[in-house]
Amino acid sequence: MDELNTLSWVLLGLGALVVGLSKTALPGAGTLAVVLFATALPARESTAGLLVLLIVGDLFAVWMYRHTVDWAILRRLIWPVLAGIAVGSVFLGLASDDAVRRVIGAILLTLLAFTLWRRRRGSTMKPGRLAGYGFGWLGGFTTMVANAGGPVMSLYLLGMRLDVKTFLGTAAYFFFAINLFKVPFQIGLGLLDLQMLSIVAVLVPLVVVAAFAGRWLASRIPQRAFEALVLVLTAVGALNLLI
């Protein structure tokens, strides 16, 4: 903790606030937290610290939407997601810090481009079983390597044309289960240790405050404007990671 400067703490604090907001009000905004954490900490270690905060945020989302879950979708995704997590774990164990940082940046830019393309195309086609396997695998890999599975799975759930509450409930349980599953991998890789937990402990209150603030802000901030801001900031951050 002594090695972190003031700017690093500011970036981590902002990232913690974004985590809380993304779980209770603004799905998809979590990619900005990925950028902030990977900028403030070594890229590989940043995934472990962010994971703990995501689980804290997941607890709020699970409690709020515990009665609206499409269990059939979750059962369909489980095996491809687990395969993606396994591949991502091997990659984290073999890749250098610079490689992980660049992969995080490339993944975020790719997801942003795909999101914008889907919006521009205005496609309403419901993803088939093969697409579900592909989204599940990529979601598992990206969530293990960069905690960036949110945009992938959000696109898939949106494509399934779920109503808002079912979407939020299904996503809440999905990410809570997946994030818990990733903890032993992070410990085994030596990324989640007591030093990282001591840093995260300082940030947990910010996640809690932002989670409650998210419920209050959700009906007051123009969704389109905020989503556009998140996309722009994430793109700038991802480019910074690639340079």
Positions of PLM-derived features:
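Transmembrane helix exit motif
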Residues: D58-T68, S89, V103-G128, R215-W216, ...
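Small-residue-mediated transmembrane helix hinge/kink sites in multi-pass secondary transporters
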Residues: V35, S89-G93, L155, R215-W216
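Interfacial loop-to-transmembrane junctions
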Residues: F212-L233
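Membrane-interface helix termini and inter-helical loops of multi-pass transporters
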Residues: M1-E3, V90-A99, Q186-S198
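Residues within membrane-spanning alpha-helices of integral membrane proteins
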Residues: W9, A48-L51, G105-L108, L112, ...
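Hydrophobic alpha-helical transmembrane segments in multi-pass integral membrane proteins
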Residues: S46, G88-G93, R101, F141-A148, ...
